[in-house]
């Protein structure tokens, strides 16, 4: 846009008056001095200060920035030259950027409409692509050997605010037709780079493609951000003509010409805590049932799975990340995988994480590729230059990645996330680009067993079918089984029926996991933090007593609690907790080495030791403590033992003690109740997580599973399909540390026959 000299001078005087008056009590004059001292060439002006000085000027800068960018630059350059005449070379000027509140002009890429073209806007989003930094010629110098004269020429494109655009062709002859030689060393260039900015994933409209806007940055703004960074960019929104000259199609490409780039905190959309919120958080952290309370508050529409819900709470809280002086990075994020039969609410748990976690990105195994999860090098359609494009895990930096149907992913694509899950970085070395991007995220995956349904006669490792190199990167691996028990099925059906009958006063359906479930918390910041008891929703048979009427937090308060504990509490290990962790890890290693019943779901490696530390730290965060105590380690071991041995166990010593007690009780009272013994925090609300033991023969669920595993391994190893009961009894007692009585063997075989897994006739057991 061409502006007459009088208007330019008037605009320049307005900015000089602003700098002279300096409403910030010397702030801008000091900023100019610092800029001159540090050899920088950009001054950032706050819009609030400009409004306080001259409201009309601030409005005109936003509405028609093309008229004011160069006068503002000239004014600042004049002030800088007065401070230091040698600061700027001939033809150089100080660039100006803007910051502060922009009102309606603070938008996301989805809100950028044609009405904003030609105005200054502040756009917030996440960087998805970055081009290489290229030089752009500003002034070319040519020498004529015939006349001995130098000829210079300036170049301006559509992105320039100074004058009209010029051609981009180098002159080869002067006005008299003499040949010219370009003096490249005397030419002037400036750096430029193209970014692609996309709206943040958590604010994307469901069912719609995310919107993207191209951003052009120049000079000192290049390389100020990388893919995966959340940024706020202030610039002028412009429409550029198409590549073909003389195009009359009316379709233009829009870009944002940036003058200020600010990196946003990952928690830019953090909730606001009131004094009452902090008081209630401390009250909840002091309760003895804090762990159960948060677990029950997560996904209340899902029946049971209390231990898995507890693990998800710890995953969202995470441990403490450590970066040592020698460059070693110790991750604090927790990775978790669920493997089990279909229709056991694995995917629903992932959706619950999407609703609660501040930043969560969902993907599927079949719909994702290795480069789509990590990063890719792509080619620009117009210029053909290479670009680095961030994948889902880079975009979810400091968040959670939910991967459903993990077993459907190709092996090559699955290997691509090995580095992310342990080192938490994505390293790219292809097409001449070598880069390392941060991907500090937790991974929660759901998968089906290799045979579709879980085969209890096989070991967990054979059912899962994934390599140990990948399994060891998961801190927790849960086996979720669909058990056929009439009592459990009745309770689940009642729970599902209550959800379908639960309606609002006007007859509409009410959401259980979203804000509708916490509607009493919407209108008042000091509203109750617990979900109001509803007879239709919660039922009448409440096994956990009267207090269970208020045993679920509202979704809004649960988000606040998790965000506060995750980001503002950084616990450290105490000596007592460290000793207990070392002892427990040694016992876990010893137990896995001596296991004869197929072992657990995960190999016990050095990564398991770090898992215990991360889980203990997450539990300390949940209790809002700044130190990790022995009780936190014990709670972490309960979750870890349940994940490894899929039983509600406490410490391994207590598990062995219970086996001895049940064995002694069986000798004295054949009809006594055995079953499974509740560990810390076990709940009658959680039947799907625990195999139901026998009440008649006093055989624990663990011994039943160990028996079935021994029988399955023996049958597969010897390629036989039938055995006598005497042979089975001798075999299991030979392989097991605790012997089985004849009545216990017959009872377990009858259970297997009822499940159509074996057929017994005349003392011979045939494997089906």
Swiss-Prot record:
Enzymatic reactions = ATP + H2O = ADP + phosphate + H(+)
What are the MCM domain coordinates in residue numbering?
290-497
Top-rank taxon: Eukaryota
Q: Please list the residue ranges that the record marks as compositionally biased, kind Gly residues.
A: 672-682
**SMART domains from the xrefs?**
AAA, MCM
Q: Where is this motif: Arginine finger?
A: 472-475
Q: Where is the composition biased (Basic and acidic residues)?
A: 661-670
Q: Keywords on this record?
A: ATP-binding, Cell cycle, DNA replication, DNA-binding, Helicase, Hydrolase, Nucleotide-binding, Nucleus
Cell compartment(s), UniProt = Nucleus
Q: Where is this region: Disordered?
A: 661-690
Pfam families on file? MCM, MCM_lid, MCM_N, MCM_OB, WH_MCM3_C
Q: What is its EC number?
A: 3.6.4.12
Cellular component terms (Gene Ontology): MCM complex; nucleus
Q: Which residues bind ATP?
A: 340-347
Q: Which residues cross the membrane?
A: none
SUPFAM superfamilies in alphabetical order: Nucleic acid-binding proteins, P-loop containing nucleoside triphosphate hydrolases
Which molecular function terms from Gene Ontology are attached? ATP binding; ATP hydrolysis activity; helicase activity; single-stranded DNA binding
> Main subcellular localization, coarse class?
nucleus
User: Biological process GO annotation list?
Assistant: DNA strand elongation involved in DNA replication; double-strand break repair via break-induced replication; mitotic DNA replication initiation
PROSITE patterns in the record, alphabetically?
MCM_1, MCM_2
Instruction: Please report which protein family the annotation says this sequence is part of.
Output: Belongs to the MCM family.
Summarizing the function annotation, the protein's role is: Acts as a factor that allows the DNA to undergo a single round of replication per cell cycle. Required for DNA replication and cell proliferation. May act as a component of the MCM complex which is the putative replicative helicase of the replication licensing system in eukaryotic cells.
- Protein's UniProt name: DNA replication licensing factor MCM3 homolog 3
